[in-house]
C-alpha cells in the first residue's frame, strides 16, 4: 500500500470531514463522561482498554506537520493550549477559590493560588480531564520531531513504542508527561492509519468479525508478567479501537452521538465541573446524571459555538 498524500488527511474542522470519525469521537467522549461518573459494568475492562487509546488514535489520525514546527505550534496553541489555559484558569483556579471564599465549599484538590501551577506537578487539579489537551500538545510536538528526523515507518513506530514504555511506564514524571506518553504508540498508529488509508481500505464485513473476536478473546487473559501484561493490554486496545472504528464506518452517523463528537472538545472541558454540580444537587443515580449531562449539551454546544468559539477551537 502506498501512503496517502498529506492533502488527503482528514480534518477535524472543515470540509474534508469523514462522518464516521465524528461518530467515533462522539462514542469516545461519551465513554469518558461515563467513566468520570463512576458507572461500573461487567464490561469495564474492555471499555477502559479502548477509551483513552481511541482518543489518542483519533488525534494521530488528524496529525499534520503544517509545513514546519513553528506553524505546528501555532496551530496546536490555538486548538489545544488556548482552550486548556482558559478552562484551567476558570474551572481549576478561579472557581475553586471563589467557591471556597464565597460559599465555603472546599475542593479535595485545593482552593488556593497554588492551583495555578498544579498541572505542572504530580498533583491533581479540579478539572482533571483538561490534562488531555496539555498532553496532546506534547504528543504532537514530540511526534513532529520524531517523524521529521526518522524516515522509516518501522523505526518511527519503534521509537514511539520505546518512548511510550520509558516515559509512560518505567518513569513517573510530572506535568502529565507520563500519563500522555503512555499512549504515544496509539498516536503513531492513528497517523499510520491515515498515511496508508487503512480504515478506508478495510472491508467491514471481512475484518470486523476478526477484530471483534480478537478484542473479546484478548480480554480473557490476565497475565501476571509485566511484559506479557503490556502486550495483552496493547493487543486488547488495538483490537478494540479497530472494532469500534469499523462499527462506526458501517453505521456512519448517529445524530446525537455524531453531533457531540464534532464538538467533543466542548464536552471534554466542561463535563467535570458539571458532574461536580450534579454532586451538589445530590443526584445519586449515575445513569440519571449521564442523561442530564447528555441533554444539557443540546444547549451548551450552541452557546459555546456562538459566544466562545476562540476558546473551544472553533476559530
Model-derived features: where do they sit?
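Alpha-helical transmembrane segments and their immediate juxtamembrane cytosolic regions
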Residues: 1-315
Amino acid at each position: 500500500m502506498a501512503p496517502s498524500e498529506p492533502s488527503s488527511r482528514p480534518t477535524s474542522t472543515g470540509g474534508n470531514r469523514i462522518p464516521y470519525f465524528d461518530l467515533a469521537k462522539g462514542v469516545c467522549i461519551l465513554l469518558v463522561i461515563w467513566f468520570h461518573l463512576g458507572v461500573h459494568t461487567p464490561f469495564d475492562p474492555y471499555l477502559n482498554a479502548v477509551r483513552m487509546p481511541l482518543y489518542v488514535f483519533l488525534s494521530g489520525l488528524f496529525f499534520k506537520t503544517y509545513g514546519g514546527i513553528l506553524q505546528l505550534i501555532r496551530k496546536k496553541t490555538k486548538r489545544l493550549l488556548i482552550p486548556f489555559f482558559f478552562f484551567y484558569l476558570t474551572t481549576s483556579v478561579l472557581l475553586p477559590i471563589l467557591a471556597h471564599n464565597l460559599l465555603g465549599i472546599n475542593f479535595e484538590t485545593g482552593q488556593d493560588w497554588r492551583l495555578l501551577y498544579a498541572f505542572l506537578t504530580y498533583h491533581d487539579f479540579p478539572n482533571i480531564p483538561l490534562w488531555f489537551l496539555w498532553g496532546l500538545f506534547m504528543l504532537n510536538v514530540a511526534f513532529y520531531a520524531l517523524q521529521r528526523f526518522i524516515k522509516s515507518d518501522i523505526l518511527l513506530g519503534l521509537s514511539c513504542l520505546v518512548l511510550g514504555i520509558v516515559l509512560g511506564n518505567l518513569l513517573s514524571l510530572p506535568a502529565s508527561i507520563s500519563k500522555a506518553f503512555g499512549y504515544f504508540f496509539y498516536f503513531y498508529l492513528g497517523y499510520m492509519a491515515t498515511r496508508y488509508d487503512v480504515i478506508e481500505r478495510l472491508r467491514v464485513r471481512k475484518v470486523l468479525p476478526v477484530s471483534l473476536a480478537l478484542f473479546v478473546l484478548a480480554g480473557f487473559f490476565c497475565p501476571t508478567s509485566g511484559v506479557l501484561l503490556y502486550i495483552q493490554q496493547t493487543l486488547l486496545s488495538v483490537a478494540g479501537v479497530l472494532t469500534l472504528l469499523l462499527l462506526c464506518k458501517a453505521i456512519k452517523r448517529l445524530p446525537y452521538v455524531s453531533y457531540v463528537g464534532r464538538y467533543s472538545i466542548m464536552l471534554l472541558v466542561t463535563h467535570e465541573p458539571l458532574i461536580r454540580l450534579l454532586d451538589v444537587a445530590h443526584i445519586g443515580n449515575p445513569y440519571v446524571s449521564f442523561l442530564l449531562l447528555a441533554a444539557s449539551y443540546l444547549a451548551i454546544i450552541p452557546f459555546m459555538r456562538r459566544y466562545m468559539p476562540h476558546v473551544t477551537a472553533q476559530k
